[in-house]
Amino acid sequence: MIKNPKVLILTAHYGNGHVQVAKTLEQTFRQKGIKDVIVCDLFGESHPVITDITKYLYLKSYTIGKELYRLFYYGVEKIYDKKIASWYANFGRKRLKLLLQAEKPDIVINTFPIIAVPELKKQTGISIPVYNVLTDFCVHKIWIHREVDRYFVATDHVKKVMVDIGVPAEQIVETGIPIRSSFELKINPDIIYNKYQLCKNKKILLIVAGAHGVLGSVKELCQSFMSVPDLQVVVVCGKNEALKQDLVGVQETNPDALKVFGYVENIDELFRVTSCMITKPGGITLSEAAALQVPVILYKPVPGQENENAMYFERKGAAVVIRDDSEVFAKTEALLQDDMKLLQMKEAMKSIYRPEPADHIVDTILEENHVEPNHIPIKSPALAQSFT
């Protein structure tokens, strides 16, 4: 039995999702009394210049580099076993060896497909349990390695795909993707309406624009949606200050019809009162939408994991996928007017959702390593406490 295990969580800053999952797992371990938890961006610390370049190319995949990213994602999938694995396995290895020697972790968790640890296990024979937490509703071969002890996946569909390509079923646990604990609390919606100055008798369209430019014509769309009766449009611009300033002028023409925000810390509050949401199909965003049963409109998914996520939610009836700019307004307006369709999408989201995935993952890891959790109560947010 390990009395006070040290946990190393490896991640990468490609989008915010992988890091957010790492932080959620870190918080969950700490809630259960495991204090020695380290989160490390292995690639960023090992090769900062290469990482910055690849992050730039990743962000460009939202605008000019979609075909390039398609070739990378699906091309690597086909040739990975033959040509890529040996190079990728050594990426970050020097930094990793120093990290393992200095910290001596008892458990290693990957929230990004980093195979340096399992490859090191294979080559040196070191004994350390390795867990991969997949952060999308699909699986790429780059996640899979014989020396990984267990995989935590979003759905039974992902598990079946992995079994089909040779991963033993007993090594795969369907838990859902870890999301922030705030998405699993109960909150009185009346307080949210008051906080954001929203009318509870009107439908709400939430557009999560963010820094990467989910929509190319947000301003024009907002102007069109503002003419729809009994509709409020809420736009979250994230850290895109230029977009926010551009929309503030539009908001001033009719502040009751359009609300513009920058970065919203407690974005779950807006998820709770929205009728549907336009967003990009990241695995964490979709998991959060499923937790709160928010119908989603997925705009122009980037080829690769985002497209795979979008197709899964579309097949399940939880999302409308739009691939053409000219269809955004008409299809969104039609959905907002179709209460039966919205209800069906909410039910589909409910069927996808897996409750408390972070707890499930952490409890499984602690149990397998014979650690008795010591739960530390965490104070709930004020809005959650006000639920009646």
From Swiss-Prot:
Gene Ontology biological process: enterobacterial common antigen biosynthetic process; glycolipid biosynthetic process; lipoteichoic acid biosynthetic process
Which CDD domains does the annotation name? GT28_Beta-DGS-like
EC number in record: 2.4.1.315
Major location, coarse class?
membrane
One GO molecular function term?
Answer: 1,2-diacylglycerol 3-glucosyltransferase activity
* Sorted UniProt keywords: Carbohydrate metabolism, Cell membrane, Glycosyltransferase, Lipid biosynthesis, Lipid metabolism, Membrane, Transferase
Does the entry feature the keyword Transferase, yes or no? yes
> Can you state which reaction this protein catalyses?
a 1,2-diacyl-3-O-(beta-D-glucopyranosyl)-sn-glycerol + UDP-alpha-D-glucose = a 1,2-diacyl-3-O-(beta-D-Glc-(1->6)-beta-D-Glc)-sn-glycerol + UDP + H(+); a 1,2-diacyl-3-O-(beta-D-Glc-(1->6)-beta-D-Glc)-sn-glycerol + UDP-alpha-D-glucose = a 1,2-diacyl-3-O-(beta-D-Glc-(1->6)-beta-D-Glc-(1->6)-beta-D-Glc)-sn-glycerol + UDP + H(+); a 1,2-diacyl-sn-glycerol + UDP-alpha-D-glucose = a 1,2-diacyl-3-O-(beta-D-glucopyranosyl)-sn-glycerol + UDP + H(+)
Family, similarity comment: Belongs to the glycosyltransferase 28 family. UgtP subfamily.
Q: What is this protein called?
A: Processive diacylglycerol beta-glucosyltransferase
Protein species of origin: Bacillus thuringiensis (strain Al Hakam)
Gene name per UniProt: ugtP
